[in-house]
Amino acid sequence: MLKSLKSRRLILKRLVTLLLSLFFSYLIFSASRNVTSSNKLNNHASERTAVESSAFNWIEKRQHQVRSENLMNRLSAYFLPFLSRSSHKERVLLRQLGNNEIAKSDKCRYIFEVLYKIDPDWDNAQTAKFYNVDGVDNTLASLLGERLRSYDYCFLSGQLDPTAIFANSTVNPHDLQNRMFPFLKKINEESKTVMWPIITDMTTGEAVPAPEVDMESSNFNGNFWSNWNRLSKGRGFVLTIAEKDVPLFLKQLKVMEFSKNELPFQIVSTGNELSTESIAKISETAKETEQRVYLVDCSTVLDTNFANTYISFFQNKWVATLFNTFEEYILLDADVVPFVGSDYFFDSPSYRESGILLFKDRVMENEQTFQYCIEMLNEVEPSAQERRFIGSRLVFDSSLPFSSETSEEASVYYNFFKKLRLHHVDSGLVVVNKLEKLNGLLMSFMLNLDGKLQRCVYGDKEIFWLGQLYAGQDYSINPVDGSIIGPVNEEPENDDGHKSGMYYICSTQIAHSDSKNRLLWVNGGLKTCKISNSAEDDFGREPEYFKSRYGDISKLKRIYDASLNVEGLIVPDVSVHPWMQIKECSNYMYCAYATGDGHTNSELDEGRLITFTEKELRYINDISRTWNAN
């Protein structure tokens, strides 16, 4: 009996020793795992931590919690399994997630289930409101970026089908889409109609039938963006225009006829922008110029209440970027005039490399954004946790040192985020491969809807590259600064009687050229002053100024209404001669200066005067006359 008792005590002692050994071994292993995990998280010294309400923050905390819980489960073995605070399935999933051994479908399902678990009422529509509280506005922007990149990781770039992933989940894929993209028409699994815009051929007046799809409408709608992209075909021009833009678009069609354009146009509308009379005028001009023009009415794919409340002015451009049916397109403002064919843009090496080509605005160093805007945008960057869990990376971010001289894109990033310069991109013409850049376009739209960010930029311009940046995409920016075309004037002679060698052009147009000094396109039309009734308004505003220079209203009106006479182009060096805004054309006129150096400057950002051959001038001014013809 005594021997048996001693034997039991010895066994118990050995068991306790074994358990203690296992305990300390686990602690050492767990510590090493935590150090490794910490090193992975902190590979960027200044990388931010996810906000408290982030799904990735919750998952990381859950991993730490389950590691401790696993130890208790091991120690209690079979005796106290009810102490565990998580299911065996979740523990396995979290361990696989930490070791990057998990299937993407399981990872994505878990991420979005956590999103709903943290906040059952989450909705990206919240970002469209301006709360004027940095903590609230910045947190919502941070969550927006994280959610959109997660959606892209799983369903756009990741090519998973949400209707399949969430087939046996607490997450409803239709509800997920409704909350992720609040501008889309609200759908559910009972939807009987495929989401598709109403498209009308404006030359025939006939409706273009929606394509036949090889799936149930609820499945198509529940994975709308992937299916929409899959059915996008061909190339074309895309516009969004209001009533006031119709006369400009009619001129644009005539220029396209002169240039022998063969690509179709799609005017993308939320449904109420154009009157019956304007539609009739466009149809008539399209027939006369033999241009194919289609009206894309998006009222069938947009949420009416959201669109009426939040989509206006510049936001309409994002509807056009997303809901045209082209695979590749050139987005145009109605007052843009191209001087090269569409193939030039689509064949551009920088466009082919990145899938989106942007052009630089005038360099206006004295106009700036705000530091609080930069602080907000830094919160949109991927957190350390997001980087670890789904591998999000940006071309540029605030945690990494870089040189602004490495590329035009780096220079723009540096000047916006470090120097706070406001104007960088002229979005009058943007070349886009929608199949490649859809996630960045969606990011752009949602950023431009953000109630706070709207106060940080002018319209949609900078959002084109910011959206691609925060979606983790690359993008291309033409390296030549926005410039000016028009009649070339020479500064008066110096006091010693010698020519000044300084030339200037004053006009309302922004011109864009390439590194070979070729004129590509102009924003602002080709009328000397495009602003209606500007002569009368100018005289009424500053009668002494305009009377001393032009005599009377009728003379100024004749000048304003004339075709722009193009003699040359100036790309100014603003560090020497900044842009000068003058009072003409309702303050829309600018002057730029350069020396007549005979194209000797090799640096693209140096100020220079560009003159054209007789053949080039004839072609340019023929287009100007075509634009201004009645």
What are these regions (language model features)?
Residues 8-630:
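Glycosyltransferase catalytic domains, chiefly GT-A lineage
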Residues 1-7:
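N-terminal Lys/Arg-rich, disordered targeting/topogenic segments
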